[in-house]
Amino acid sequence: MIRVRRGYIARRRRTKFFLFASTFRGAHSRLTRTTTQQKMRALVSAHRDRGRQKRDFRRLWITRINAVTRENGGSYSRLIHDLYKGQLLLNRKIPAQLAISNGNCLYMISNEIGSANKEIGRSSSE
């Protein structure tokens, strides 16, 4: 019986794996079995760390905002509370960028919002 040569499909599949793993080191980029295992591990790590990256950046932004507001005698929680009361929809990223580039600007915004909220509170109680 004649030996059947395999078609191009398996070779094409392996080529895709090798292209994905071409930057891996050692046998992880050369051997088929370890390449497939490393590809699966890499994809699992990428999926897991996408969520982790969002958490880490949010924590970093909160830390930066808190550092600048505490320098000026405020606190992060008070700033966020004032933002919500003033109906200013800002995510954590924008105030964090303001805190890095110009901390005084963030301080002025927080003071302005705080004073505006106090005036609104007085007028509604009268």
From Swiss-Prot:
Family matches, as InterPro entries: Ribosomal_bL20, RIBOSOMAL_L20_CS, Ribosomal_protein_bL20_C
UniProt-listed PROSITE patterns: RIBOSOMAL_L20
Presence of the UniProt keyword Ribonucleoprotein in the record: yes
GO CC terms, sorted: chloroplast; ribonucleoprotein complex; ribosome
UniProt keyword annotations, A-Z: Chloroplast, Plastid, Ribonucleoprotein, Ribosomal protein, RNA-binding, rRNA-binding
Chain coiled-coil ranges: none
Gene Ontology biological process terms in this record: ribosomal large subunit assembly; translation
Primary localization: plastid
Keyword RNA-binding included in the entry's annotation: yes
Intracellular or extracellular location(s): Plastid, Chloroplast
GO terms assigned for molecular function: rRNA binding; structural constituent of ribosome
Record-linked PANTHER family: 39S RIBOSOMAL PROTEIN L20
Similarity annotation: Belongs to the bacterial ribosomal protein bL20 family.
Summary of the function given for this chain in its UniProt record: Binds directly to 23S ribosomal RNA and is necessary for the in vitro assembly process of the 50S ribosomal subunit. It is not involved in the protein synthesizing functions of that subunit.
Protein name: Large ribosomal subunit protein bL20c
Organism of derivation: Illicium oligandrum (Star anise)
Name of the coding gene: rpl20
